[in-house]
């Protein structure tokens, strides 16, 4: 689901410490907005399109993308007659290497409308896999791009390279990333710009990238580390297509619109059956872009102890499990729920009806648009609101575990419009003035009602949030 409504919020950091911290994280990883990012290249207007600029593909541009495109692949068992001239001394994949390559193939099939079929007959395969020991050009790995006229392309890997000698093919390993990268080439994806490992001068982000998003935070097809665009993966590599890879491959072949159509959990308690989406313990390292097609879905990062920043908006990046910008959400995808860990987390909702649970720690909870259900968990938590649109009377948020004297509701940056220069202030009854706030307690339901009037008679355009539990006090609020 794309964001249909946008929240406008002030960039004037005159709010509370927590509200200003939220603003910082709403702008995280956005070039020109995030002060921690050095922008060496201008952002692309369509970075995904850059990956398919050569229009390399299987089939034709006008093929029906609603029908899955079938590709056969094979692991070579002997030296082929058409082995590239600059490599020699063929060797076959062992079973562990085959299994890793199949996981990379599966990761592309998960996001694109492509049906991969394995065949033992190499001659009928569209994509082949093989190793070599010697390269006249010093190649580590390479693959050939497809065209509508071709019937077969090969992917080749240097068996004597440190990556494969060390068998670094597990999830987050460089070998696994290499398989995913080279398979991307066989499907028609290029490097983000016109550089290659065979260039006389080794490519660098500064000298070879032509736009900001050319990093391994955005695409497995890049040569350049994620730190160039502000992220930090602490030495691990993506095992699956990332944000711009997914958009690019779907533009060519269409999307896989049936995968993960039910309620899906990513992270701890994952039901994805994908290792790169799964956290097993507090030492797990996650690196992925979530592609999801339906259901009521959850980012469960409850087992991590570090301070996390979890953003549920499409095309956004989250800091999870001690890494920076390591989790993102594909364009057009809605993840409804998030569960934080035991650190001091920031949870940011989208325009769906989110369920956000902070867990232990002093968390910042921001539901955004939609009728949200919010839990701070243990610790001193702050629920921030920036606009009446985030909890109008007909789509009210519910805060379920507020503890008076510990937790806070922060409206210090609440947008009251041009007429609300006086800020939010408590009154006994609404009189129609902008910024008037009323706090009521229902002793029967044990629910607090907090409302803000934007002017005139209180109506569906105003603000109303429900707070479950014991009576709360005006001192539990941070006003503008």
UniProtKB/Swiss-Prot annotation:
Binds 1 zinc ion per subunit. InterPro entries: Hemolysin-typ_Ca-bd_CS, Hemolysn_Ca-bd, MetalloPept_cat_dom_sf, Pept_M10B, Peptidase_M10B_C, Peptidase_Metallo, Serralysin-like, Serralysin-like_metalloprot_C. The active site is at residue 182. Disulfide bonds: none annotated. Ca(2+) 1 binds at residues 260, 263, 292, 294, 297. GO terms for molecular function: calcium ion binding; metalloendopeptidase activity; zinc ion binding. Its EC number is 3.4.24.40. It catalyses: Preferential cleavage of bonds with hydrophobic residues in P1'. GO terms for cellular component: extracellular space. Keywords: Calcium, Hydrolase, Metal-binding, Metalloprotease, Protease, Repeat, Secreted, Zinc. Its cofactor is Zn(2+); Ca(2+). Signal peptide: none annotated. Belongs to the peptidase M10B family. This is Serralysin. It comes from Photorhabdus laumondii subsp. laumondii (strain DSM 15139 / CIP 105565 / TT01) (Photorhabdus luminescens subsp. laumondii). The gene is prtA.
């Amino acid at each position: 689901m794309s964001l249909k409504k946008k929240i406008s919020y002030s960039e004037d950091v005159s709010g509370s410490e927590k509200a200003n911290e939220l603003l910082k994280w709403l702008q995280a990883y956005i070039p020109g907005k995030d002060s921690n990012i050095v922008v060496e290249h201008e952002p692309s207007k369509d970075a995904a399109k850059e990956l398919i600029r050569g229009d390399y593909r299987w089939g034709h541009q006008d093929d029906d993308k609603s029908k899955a495109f079938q590709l056969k692949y094979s692991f070579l068992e002997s030296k082929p007659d058409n082995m590239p001239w600059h490599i020699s001394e063929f060797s076959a994949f062992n079973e562990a290497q085959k299994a890793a390559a199949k996981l990379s193939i599966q990761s592309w099939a998960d996001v694109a409308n492509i049906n991969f079929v394995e065949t033992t007959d190499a001659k009928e395969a569209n994509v082949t896999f093989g190793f070599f020991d010697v390269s006249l050009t010093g190649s580590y790995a390479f693959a050939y791009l497809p065209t509508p006229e071709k019937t077969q392309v090969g992917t080749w890997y240097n068996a004597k390279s440190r990556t494969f000698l060390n068998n670094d093919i597990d999830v987050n390993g460089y070998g696994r990333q290499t398989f995913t990268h080279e398979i991307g080439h066989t499907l028609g994806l290029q490097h983000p710009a016109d550089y290659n490992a065979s260039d006389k001068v080794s490519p660098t982000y500064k000298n070879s990238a032509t736009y900001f998003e050319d990093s391994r935070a955005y695409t497995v097809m890049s040569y350049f580390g994620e730190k160039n665009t502000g992220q930090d993966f602490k030495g691990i590599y993506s095992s699956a297509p990332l944000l711009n890879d997914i958009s690019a491959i779907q533009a060519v072949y269409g999307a896989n619109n049936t995968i993960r159509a039910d309620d899906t959990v990513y992270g701890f308690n994952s039901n994805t059956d994908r290792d790169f989406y799964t956290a097993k313990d507090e030492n797990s390292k996650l690196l992925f872009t979530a592609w999801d097609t339906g259901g009521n879905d959850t980012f469960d990062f409850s087992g991590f102890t570090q301070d996390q920043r979890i953003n549920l908006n499409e095309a956004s990046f989250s800091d999870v499990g001690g890494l920076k910008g390591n989790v993102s959400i594909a364009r057009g995808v809605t993840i409804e729920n998030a569960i934080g860990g035991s650190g001091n987390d920031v949870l940011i909702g989208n325009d769906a009806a989110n369920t956000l649970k902070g867990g232990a720690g002093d968390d910042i909870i921001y539901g955004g648009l939609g009728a949200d259900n919010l839990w701070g968990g243990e610790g001193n938590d702050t629920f921030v609101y920036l606009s009446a649109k985030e909890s109008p009377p007909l789509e009210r948020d519910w805060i379920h575990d507020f503890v008076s004297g510990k937790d806070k509701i922060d409206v210090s940056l609440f947008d009251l419009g041009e007429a609300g220069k006086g800020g939010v202030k408590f009154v006994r009854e609404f009189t129609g003035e902008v910024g008037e706030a009323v706090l009521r307690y229902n002793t029967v339901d044990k629910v607090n009602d907090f409302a803000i009037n934007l002017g005139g008679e209180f109506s569906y355009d105003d603000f109303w949030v429900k707070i479950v539990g014991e009576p709360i006090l005006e001192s539990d609020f941070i006003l503008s």
